[in-house]
Amino acid sequence: MNIVKIGGNVIDDAEKLAGFLYRFSRLPGKKILVHGGGKIATRVAGELGIESRMTEGRRITDAPMRDVVTMVYGGLVNKRMVAGLQSLGCNAIGLTGADGAAILSHKRPVKTIDYGYVGDVEKVNVPFITLLLQNGLSPVFAPLTFDAGGDILNTNADTQASEIARALSRGEAVNLVYCFEKKGVLKDAADDDSVISRLTPETYEQYKSEGIIYDGMIPKLDNAFAAIRAGVRKVIICDADDLAEAVEGSAGTTIEI
């Protein structure tokens, strides 16, 4: 089974997104797509007169912004992808974590920063997701979950994909693929061909200490290594254009322990 997470920069590029959806639709066997939000929520919020607040690159999800991301991520972005996949013969079904109680979370506790209505995953409903897959459906998850009190929570898509992969890996072999706009983890951010083909915990720590791996790539890789340690067979980070090749092992960065 392949669980594929697609980033916001791909979602914001209509041509790149169309190409990705075609390649995803052609993956053999069971597959799940988890998508980020892109910049559409910021645009829609602006049109509605709602302020978008960010800190350290992360969105602050207050009550008005939660309404926006629910509409945009769970509605517009998700359903556009589902419609695109259906047109390609992929029997996709669009979901949030609230649908079928697929992903239960709790509201992130306030430490130094109050991120608002942001969720940390507690439980993945494996029987429900397995039922969909067994009936030939490909779930497409928006980055939204819910808590026991019925609140919708904005949820990091990288973490959501990792948690789904970890939960499903207890029953079968799972590949987790993070697709974004680069060819993989790069030694030189200015050189798209400087892909690190294999990354171990030792080389990861080395590259972090040398400043080669930094900023937003660190939480992505932390999620990747956590998934491998929890039983996911393979984690790959790649360009959305190289999805098929990455799954076959000939493109992107493969995470190993």
Residue spans of the language-model regions?
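C-terminal catalytic "cap/lid" subdomain
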Residues: 1-257
